Amino acid sequence: MTNIRKSHPLFKIINDSFIDLPAPSSISSWWNFGSLLGVCLAVQILTGLFLAMHYTSDTATAFYSVTHICRDVNYGWVLRYLHANGASMFFICLFLHVGRGIYYGSYTFSETWNIGIILLFAVMATAFMGYVLPWGQMSFWGATVITNLLSAIPYVGTTLVEWVWGGFSVDKATLTRFFALHFLLPFIISAMVMVHLLFLHETGSNNPTGIPSDADMIPFHPYYTIKDILGLVLMLMALLSLVLFAPDLLGDPDNYTPANPLNTPPHIKPEWYFLFAYAILRSIPNKLGGVVALVLSILVLAVIPLLHTSKQRSMTFRPLSQCLFWLLVADLLTLTWIGGQPVEHPFIIIGQLASILYFLIILVLMPLASIAENHLLKW
Protein backbone atom coordinates (compact mmCIF):
# COMPACT_ATOMS: atom_id res chain seq x y z
CA MET A 1 0.00 0.00 0.00
CA THR A 2 1.37 3.43 -0.94
CA ASN A 3 1.86 6.11 1.69
CA ILE A 4 -1.28 8.24 2.17
CA ARG A 5 0.69 11.44 1.69
CA LYS A 6 1.63 10.25 -1.82
CA SER A 7 -1.77 8.86 -2.83
CA HIS A 8 -4.38 11.18 -1.29
CA PRO A 9 -5.25 13.96 -3.81
CA LEU A 10 -4.96 16.78 -1.25
CA PHE A 11 -2.00 15.45 0.75
CA LYS A 12 -0.18 14.75 -2.51
CA ILE A 13 -0.17 18.49 -3.36
CA ILE A 14 1.21 19.33 0.10
CA ASN A 15 3.75 16.50 -0.18
CA ASP A 16 4.98 17.65 -3.59
CA SER A 17 5.27 21.25 -2.38
CA PHE A 18 6.77 20.93 1.11
CA ILE A 19 8.01 17.38 1.77
CA ASP A 20 9.32 15.46 -1.25
CA LEU A 21 10.07 18.61 -3.26
CA PRO A 22 13.54 18.32 -4.85
CA ALA A 23 15.57 21.37 -3.76
CA PRO A 24 19.12 22.45 -4.70
CA SER A 25 21.63 21.35 -2.05
CA SER A 26 23.43 24.70 -2.00
CA ILE A 27 20.68 27.27 -1.33
CA SER A 28 21.65 29.65 1.46
CA SER A 29 19.65 31.47 4.14
CA TRP A 30 18.65 34.05 1.51
CA TRP A 31 16.16 31.42 0.33
CA ASN A 32 14.43 31.45 3.75
CA PHE A 33 12.43 34.60 3.07
CA GLY A 34 9.73 32.92 0.95
CA SER A 35 8.60 30.80 3.90
CA LEU A 36 9.00 33.76 6.28
CA LEU A 37 6.70 35.82 4.04
CA GLY A 38 4.15 32.99 4.18
CA VAL A 39 4.30 33.08 7.99
CA CYS A 40 4.01 36.90 7.99
CA LEU A 41 0.90 36.65 5.81
CA ALA A 42 -0.64 34.05 8.14
CA VAL A 43 0.14 36.19 11.22
CA GLN A 44 -1.36 39.28 9.55
CA ILE A 45 -4.55 37.44 8.52
CA LEU A 46 -5.03 35.92 12.00
CA THR A 47 -4.30 39.08 14.02
CA GLY A 48 -6.32 41.13 11.51
CA LEU A 49 -9.30 38.81 11.82
CA PHE A 50 -9.38 39.19 15.62
CA LEU A 51 -8.89 42.97 15.36
CA ALA A 52 -11.79 43.18 12.87
CA MET A 53 -14.05 41.56 15.49
CA HIS A 54 -13.67 44.68 17.68
CA TYR A 55 -13.02 47.42 15.12
CA THR A 56 -15.73 49.75 13.77
CA SER A 57 -15.20 51.41 10.38
CA ASP A 58 -17.04 54.63 11.17
CA THR A 59 -15.29 58.02 11.31
CA ALA A 60 -16.94 58.83 14.66
CA THR A 61 -15.82 55.65 16.42
CA ALA A 62 -12.85 54.15 14.46
CA PHE A 63 -10.12 55.85 16.53
CA TYR A 64 -11.87 54.99 19.82
CA SER A 65 -12.50 51.38 18.77
CA VAL A 66 -8.71 50.96 18.34
CA THR A 67 -8.17 52.57 21.76
CA HIS A 68 -10.81 50.18 23.18
CA ILE A 69 -8.96 47.19 21.64
CA CYS A 70 -5.72 48.28 23.33
CA ARG A 71 -7.26 49.05 26.74
CA ASP A 72 -10.25 46.76 27.26
CA VAL A 73 -9.90 43.68 25.04
CA ASN A 74 -7.95 40.76 26.52
CA TYR A 75 -4.45 40.97 24.99
CA GLY A 76 -5.88 43.44 22.46
CA TRP A 77 -2.69 45.51 22.68
CA VAL A 78 -0.67 42.42 21.66
CA LEU A 79 -2.97 41.86 18.67
CA ARG A 80 -2.79 45.51 17.60
CA TYR A 81 1.01 45.79 17.87
CA LEU A 82 1.61 42.34 16.35
CA HIS A 83 -0.46 43.46 13.38
CA ALA A 84 1.22 46.87 13.04
CA ASN A 85 4.79 45.61 13.51
CA GLY A 86 3.99 42.41 11.61
CA ALA A 87 3.47 44.66 8.58
CA SER A 88 6.97 46.11 9.09
CA MET A 89 8.42 42.61 9.34
CA PHE A 90 6.46 41.64 6.21
CA PHE A 91 8.11 44.47 4.26
CA ILE A 92 11.60 43.75 5.63
CA CYS A 93 11.22 40.16 4.38
CA LEU A 94 9.74 41.39 1.08
CA PHE A 95 12.63 43.76 0.38
CA LEU A 96 15.21 41.08 1.25
CA HIS A 97 13.33 38.53 -0.89
CA VAL A 98 13.28 40.87 -3.92
CA GLY A 99 16.93 41.84 -3.31
CA ARG A 100 17.87 38.15 -3.27
CA GLY A 101 16.01 37.70 -6.57
CA ILE A 102 17.96 40.56 -8.19
CA TYR A 103 21.36 39.48 -6.80
CA TYR A 104 21.10 35.82 -7.76
CA GLY A 105 19.28 36.32 -11.08
CA SER A 106 16.06 34.59 -9.95
CA TYR A 107 14.16 37.08 -12.15
CA THR A 108 14.89 34.85 -15.15
CA PHE A 109 11.91 32.77 -13.96
CA SER A 110 9.72 35.38 -15.64
CA GLU A 111 6.26 34.09 -14.60
CA THR A 112 7.28 33.72 -10.94
CA TRP A 113 8.97 37.14 -11.02
CA ASN A 114 6.02 38.95 -12.64
CA ILE A 115 3.50 37.45 -10.21
CA GLY A 116 5.88 38.51 -7.44
CA ILE A 117 5.74 42.12 -8.70
CA ILE A 118 1.91 42.02 -8.74
CA LEU A 119 2.05 40.59 -5.19
CA LEU A 120 4.32 43.46 -4.13
CA PHE A 121 1.82 46.01 -5.49
CA ALA A 122 -1.06 44.18 -3.75
CA VAL A 123 0.75 44.07 -0.39
CA MET A 124 1.64 47.77 -0.68
CA ALA A 125 -2.00 48.65 -1.43
CA THR A 126 -3.17 46.55 1.53
CA ALA A 127 -0.65 48.15 3.90
CA PHE A 128 -1.63 51.65 2.76
CA MET A 129 -5.33 51.00 3.37
CA GLY A 130 -4.56 49.42 6.75
CA TYR A 131 -2.68 52.55 7.81
CA VAL A 132 -5.84 54.61 7.21
CA LEU A 133 -8.05 52.48 9.48
CA PRO A 134 -7.01 53.74 12.97
CA TRP A 135 -8.24 57.17 11.79
CA GLY A 136 -5.47 59.17 13.44
CA GLN A 137 -4.02 62.38 11.98
CA MET A 138 -1.44 60.61 9.79
CA SER A 139 -4.09 58.06 8.69
CA PHE A 140 -6.41 60.82 7.47
CA TRP A 141 -3.80 63.06 5.86
CA GLY A 142 -1.88 60.12 4.38
CA ALA A 143 -5.13 58.93 2.76
CA THR A 144 -5.88 62.46 1.50
CA VAL A 145 -2.41 63.01 0.00
CA ILE A 146 -1.95 59.59 -1.61
CA THR A 147 -5.48 59.25 -3.07
CA ASN A 148 -5.15 62.83 -4.36
CA LEU A 149 -2.28 61.66 -6.58
CA LEU A 150 -4.91 60.09 -8.86
CA SER A 151 -6.04 63.62 -9.77
CA ALA A 152 -2.78 63.95 -11.75
CA ILE A 153 -4.19 61.55 -14.37
CA PRO A 154 -5.23 63.71 -17.33
CA TYR A 155 -8.96 64.22 -18.06
CA VAL A 156 -10.40 61.61 -15.66
CA GLY A 157 -8.25 62.44 -12.60
CA THR A 158 -10.69 64.51 -10.51
CA THR A 159 -13.62 62.20 -11.24
CA LEU A 160 -11.48 59.20 -10.30
CA VAL A 161 -10.43 60.73 -6.96
CA GLU A 162 -14.05 61.52 -6.01
CA TRP A 163 -15.06 58.00 -7.06
CA VAL A 164 -12.36 56.50 -4.78
CA TRP A 165 -13.37 58.81 -1.92
CA GLY A 166 -17.08 58.18 -2.34
CA GLY A 167 -17.67 61.92 -1.92
CA PHE A 168 -15.87 65.25 -2.11
CA SER A 169 -13.32 64.49 0.60
CA VAL A 170 -11.87 61.58 2.59
CA ASP A 171 -14.79 60.73 4.88
CA LYS A 172 -16.99 57.93 6.24
CA ALA A 173 -17.50 56.28 2.82
CA THR A 174 -13.71 56.22 2.23
CA LEU A 175 -13.00 54.61 5.60
CA THR A 176 -15.71 51.96 5.14
CA ARG A 177 -14.50 50.93 1.67
CA PHE A 178 -10.86 50.91 2.78
CA PHE A 179 -11.79 48.55 5.63
CA ALA A 180 -13.71 46.26 3.25
CA LEU A 181 -10.81 46.18 0.77
CA HIS A 182 -8.18 45.83 3.50
CA PHE A 183 -10.06 42.77 4.78
CA LEU A 184 -10.49 41.27 1.30
CA LEU A 185 -7.05 41.80 -0.27
CA PRO A 186 -5.01 39.44 1.97
CA PHE A 187 -7.17 36.52 0.81
CA ILE A 188 -6.57 37.50 -2.83
CA ILE A 189 -2.86 37.75 -1.96
CA SER A 190 -3.02 34.21 -0.46
CA ALA A 191 -4.46 32.87 -3.72
CA MET A 192 -1.77 34.68 -5.72
CA VAL A 193 0.93 33.25 -3.44
CA MET A 194 -0.25 29.77 -4.45
CA VAL A 195 0.08 30.74 -8.14
CA HIS A 196 3.54 32.20 -7.36
CA LEU A 197 4.53 28.83 -5.85
CA LEU A 198 2.92 26.90 -8.70
CA PHE A 199 5.12 28.70 -11.24
CA LEU A 200 8.19 28.33 -9.01
CA HIS A 201 7.68 24.57 -8.77
CA GLU A 202 7.40 24.35 -12.57
CA THR A 203 11.08 25.36 -12.83
CA GLY A 204 12.48 24.48 -9.41
CA SER A 205 14.50 26.84 -7.24
CA ASN A 206 17.51 28.84 -8.36
CA ASN A 207 20.72 28.58 -6.29
CA PRO A 208 23.61 30.92 -5.32
CA THR A 209 25.82 29.82 -8.23
CA GLY A 210 23.12 30.44 -10.85
CA ILE A 211 24.08 27.11 -12.45
CA PRO A 212 21.33 24.46 -12.99
CA SER A 213 21.40 22.06 -10.05
CA ASP A 214 19.34 19.18 -11.48
CA ALA A 215 22.21 16.76 -10.85
CA ASP A 216 22.41 17.60 -7.15
CA MET A 217 18.99 17.84 -5.49
CA ILE A 218 17.92 16.95 -1.95
CA PRO A 219 14.41 16.51 -0.47
CA PHE A 220 12.91 19.65 1.07
CA HIS A 221 12.05 17.76 4.27
CA PRO A 222 13.91 17.47 6.65
CA TYR A 223 16.79 19.63 5.35
CA TYR A 224 14.97 22.83 4.48
CA THR A 225 12.06 22.44 6.89
CA ILE A 226 14.52 22.62 9.79
CA LYS A 227 16.38 25.49 8.10
CA ASP A 228 13.10 27.39 7.60
CA ILE A 229 12.12 26.78 11.23
CA LEU A 230 15.43 28.33 12.38
CA GLY A 231 14.72 31.42 10.23
CA LEU A 232 11.17 31.50 11.57
CA VAL A 233 12.33 31.41 15.21
CA LEU A 234 14.79 34.26 14.59
CA MET A 235 12.14 36.35 12.83
CA LEU A 236 9.54 35.76 15.55
CA MET A 237 12.13 36.69 18.21
CA ALA A 238 12.78 39.97 16.38
CA LEU A 239 9.05 40.63 15.94
CA LEU A 240 8.18 39.84 19.56
CA SER A 241 11.08 41.98 20.82
CA LEU A 242 9.70 44.86 18.77
CA VAL A 243 6.11 44.29 19.95
CA LEU A 244 6.95 43.85 23.64
CA PHE A 245 9.79 46.37 24.11
CA ALA A 246 9.32 49.12 21.49
CA PRO A 247 5.86 48.75 19.90
CA ASP A 248 5.73 52.38 18.69
CA LEU A 249 9.31 52.56 17.41
CA LEU A 250 8.29 52.43 13.74
CA GLY A 251 4.98 54.29 14.09
CA ASP A 252 4.18 58.00 13.92
CA PRO A 253 3.26 59.92 17.12
CA ASP A 254 0.76 61.98 15.05
CA ASN A 255 -1.40 58.88 14.69
CA TYR A 256 -2.25 59.04 18.40
CA THR A 257 -4.19 62.24 17.68
CA PRO A 258 -7.72 61.65 16.28
CA ALA A 259 -8.15 62.68 12.62
CA ASN A 260 -8.96 66.36 12.19
CA PRO A 261 -9.61 67.68 8.65
CA LEU A 262 -9.08 71.28 9.90
CA ASN A 263 -5.56 70.72 11.23
CA THR A 264 -2.75 69.58 8.90
CA PRO A 265 0.29 67.89 10.55
CA PRO A 266 3.61 69.71 9.86
CA HIS A 267 5.16 66.72 8.06
CA ILE A 268 2.87 64.27 6.26
CA LYS A 269 4.75 61.04 5.65
CA PRO A 270 3.81 57.37 5.13
CA GLU A 271 5.09 54.36 7.07
CA TRP A 272 8.87 53.76 6.84
CA TYR A 273 8.54 51.04 4.19
CA PHE A 274 7.03 53.49 1.67
CA LEU A 275 9.52 56.31 2.28
CA PHE A 276 11.84 55.35 -0.61
CA ALA A 277 8.94 55.59 -3.10
CA TYR A 278 7.65 58.75 -1.39
CA ALA A 279 11.10 60.36 -1.78
CA ILE A 280 11.08 59.53 -5.52
CA LEU A 281 7.55 61.01 -5.79
CA ARG A 282 8.62 64.25 -4.06
CA SER A 283 11.85 64.60 -6.05
CA ILE A 284 9.93 65.61 -9.19
CA PRO A 285 8.33 69.11 -9.03
CA ASN A 286 5.58 68.15 -11.51
CA LYS A 287 2.56 66.28 -10.06
CA LEU A 288 1.97 63.88 -12.97
CA GLY A 289 5.72 63.31 -13.36
CA GLY A 290 5.97 62.44 -9.68
CA VAL A 291 3.11 59.94 -9.88
CA VAL A 292 4.67 58.30 -12.96
CA ALA A 293 8.05 58.08 -11.17
CA LEU A 294 6.33 56.61 -8.09
CA VAL A 295 4.70 53.81 -10.12
CA LEU A 296 7.89 53.22 -12.14
CA SER A 297 9.96 52.89 -8.95
CA ILE A 298 8.28 49.49 -8.44
CA LEU A 299 7.36 48.70 -12.06
CA VAL A 300 11.05 49.01 -13.05
CA LEU A 301 11.45 45.52 -11.51
CA ALA A 302 9.52 44.13 -14.51
CA VAL A 303 12.21 45.48 -16.87
CA ILE A 304 15.14 43.83 -15.05
CA PRO A 305 14.78 40.42 -16.85
CA LEU A 306 14.76 42.22 -20.23
CA LEU A 307 17.99 44.05 -19.37
CA HIS A 308 19.92 40.93 -18.31
CA THR A 309 22.93 41.14 -20.63
CA SER A 310 25.33 38.91 -18.67
CA LYS A 311 26.33 35.41 -19.77
CA GLN A 312 26.07 34.38 -16.12
CA ARG A 313 22.83 34.27 -14.20
CA SER A 314 23.94 35.08 -10.67
CA MET A 315 26.10 37.98 -9.41
CA THR A 316 28.19 35.55 -7.29
CA PHE A 317 31.13 35.69 -9.71
CA ARG A 318 30.53 39.22 -11.07
CA PRO A 319 32.36 41.83 -8.93
CA LEU A 320 31.33 44.88 -11.03
CA SER A 321 27.64 44.00 -10.80
CA GLN A 322 28.05 43.30 -7.07
CA CYS A 323 29.42 46.84 -6.52
CA LEU A 324 26.44 48.29 -8.39
CA PHE A 325 24.00 46.11 -6.46
CA TRP A 326 25.29 47.33 -3.09
CA LEU A 327 25.33 50.89 -4.43
CA LEU A 328 21.63 50.39 -5.24
CA VAL A 329 21.00 49.15 -1.67
CA ALA A 330 22.80 52.21 -0.24
CA ASP A 331 20.79 54.43 -2.62
CA LEU A 332 17.50 52.91 -1.42
CA LEU A 333 18.51 53.49 2.21
CA THR A 334 19.34 57.11 1.32
CA LEU A 335 15.91 57.51 -0.34
CA THR A 336 14.24 56.02 2.75
CA TRP A 337 16.03 58.58 4.95
CA ILE A 338 15.16 61.48 2.59
CA GLY A 339 11.48 60.44 2.47
CA GLY A 340 11.22 61.09 6.20
CA GLN A 341 12.87 64.54 6.03
CA PRO A 342 11.14 67.91 5.43
CA VAL A 343 11.15 69.37 1.90
CA GLU A 344 14.03 71.85 2.28
CA HIS A 345 17.69 72.28 1.34
CA PRO A 346 19.81 70.06 1.28
CA PHE A 347 17.25 67.22 1.37
CA ILE A 348 15.59 68.23 -1.93
CA ILE A 349 18.77 67.94 -4.02
CA ILE A 350 19.91 64.75 -2.21
CA GLY A 351 16.50 63.18 -2.97
CA GLN A 352 16.67 64.20 -6.63
CA LEU A 353 20.20 62.82 -7.06
CA ALA A 354 19.29 59.57 -5.25
CA SER A 355 16.16 59.18 -7.45
CA ILE A 356 18.17 59.68 -10.65
CA LEU A 357 20.82 57.24 -9.41
CA TYR A 358 18.15 54.61 -8.58
CA PHE A 359 16.86 54.47 -12.17
CA LEU A 360 20.36 54.95 -13.63
CA ILE A 361 21.78 51.90 -11.81
CA ILE A 362 18.93 49.58 -12.79
CA LEU A 363 18.33 50.75 -16.37
CA VAL A 364 21.83 51.75 -17.54
CA LEU A 365 24.76 50.88 -15.28
CA MET A 366 23.89 47.24 -14.45
CA PRO A 367 23.38 46.17 -18.10
CA LEU A 368 26.62 47.99 -19.08
CA ALA A 369 28.54 46.34 -16.22
CA SER A 370 27.26 42.93 -17.38
CA ILE A 371 28.51 43.61 -20.93
CA ALA A 372 31.90 44.69 -19.53
CA GLU A 373 32.09 41.48 -17.46
CA ASN A 374 31.31 39.40 -20.55
CA HIS A 375 34.30 41.00 -22.30
CA LEU A 376 36.53 40.50 -19.25
CA LEU A 377 35.69 36.78 -19.32
CA LYS A 378 37.20 36.49 -22.81
CA TRP A 379 40.65 37.48 -21.52
UniProtKB/Swiss-Prot annotation:
UniProt KW keywords: Electron transport, Heme, Iron, Membrane, Metal-binding, Mitochondrion, Mitochondrion inner membrane, Respiratory chain, Transmembrane, Transmembrane helix, Transport, Ubiquinone
Top-rank taxon, per record: Eukaryota
Read off the Gene3D superfamilies from this record. Cytochrome Bc1 Complex, Chain C
Name a GO molecular-function annotation: ubiquinol-cytochrome-c reductase activity
Q: Does the keyword Electron transport apply?
A: yes
- The entry's a ubiquinone-binding residues are H201
Q: Which GO terms describe its biological process?
A: mitochondrial electron transport, ubiquinol to cytochrome c
Protein name (record): Cytochrome b
Q: Which organism is it from?
A: Rhinolophus pusillus blythi (Horsehoe bat)
Q: Which gene encodes it?
A: MT-CYB
